[in-house]
A protein has these predicted regions:
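Metabolite-binding pocket within alpha/beta catalytic cores that recognizes anionic/polar moieties
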Residues: 1-53, 57-61, 117
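Short acidic/polar active-site loop segments enriched in Thr and Asp
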Residues: 10-11, 102, 121
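Active-site rim beta-loop-alpha module in soluble metabolic enzymes
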Residues: 50-98
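Generic structural signal for well-ordered, non-membrane alpha-helical segments
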Residues: 52, 56-60, 72, 89, ...
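Generic non-transmembrane alpha-helical segments
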Residues: 62-70, 114, 154-165
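Zn-dependent metallopeptidase/amidohydrolase metal-coordination segment
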Residues: 109-143
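His/Asp/Glu-rich mid-to-C-terminal helical/loop segments that flank catalytic regions of hydrolases
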Residues: 132-176
Length: 176
């Protein structure tokens, strides 16, 4: 990301998969990340200690409007970023769910912290690959491959729409 930033890129649309924590969340819906719980190491090299790091309101609003307009199922939500996936213990899972996380992944907090530090805009759209349970790991979600292809198409469409927008500085922020 930083290398791309040095070449003048300042808006980052990120997609990826995540383990589902909140089983009430429809697994076929996408997660538009509003904020990430910082439980990894990289973000602390870029920002002062804090529980959360927010993603870009500007890009989130752009993605939100695109997803609504095109009929995709999604929810703005919080993710938990950790770089120690073998330490997703029952106690830590409970704590992160209490703190609002609907899913767990390994990069959002780090990327969002770098973006904030460097003055970039970053948003992340996630799909569920599996369910992280307190006592075991589930198999991969049956829609995983379909959702991965769908999120890749969404990202390509978003970038094209963003680049062809007359003035992306005038993106209207939406309340999520």
């Amino acid at each position: 990301m930083e290398n791309l930033g040095f070449f003048g890129i300042s808006n980052f649309f990120v997609c990826g998969d995540a383990g589902q924590l909140d089983t009430d969340f429809d697994p076929s819906e996408f997660v538009l990340v509003k904020q990430a719980i910082r439980d990894e190491g990289t973000s602390y090299h870029y920002l002062p200690p804090a529980m959360y790091v927010e993603t870009s309101k500007k890009l989130n609003s752009f993605i939100y409007s695109y997803l609504k307009r095109n009929g995709y199922k999604f929810q703005p939500a919080t993710t938990w970023t950790t770089d120690a996936f073998y330490r997703e213990t029952p106690k830590s899972i409970d704590r992160r769910i209490e703190q609002g996380a609907v899913c767990v992944e390994m990069e959002c907090a780090s990327l969002a912290a770098i973006a904030k530090y460097r003055g970039y805009e970053l948003s992340q759209l996630l799909y569920f690959s599996d369910v992280v349970k307190k006592d075991s790991w589930s198999t991969f979600h049956p829609l995983r491959d379909e959702l991965r292809l769908m999120v890749q198409k969404i990202m390509l469409d978003l970038v094209e729409e963003f680049l062809t927008a007359k003035n992306n500085d005038e993106i209207e922020e939406v309340e999520m």
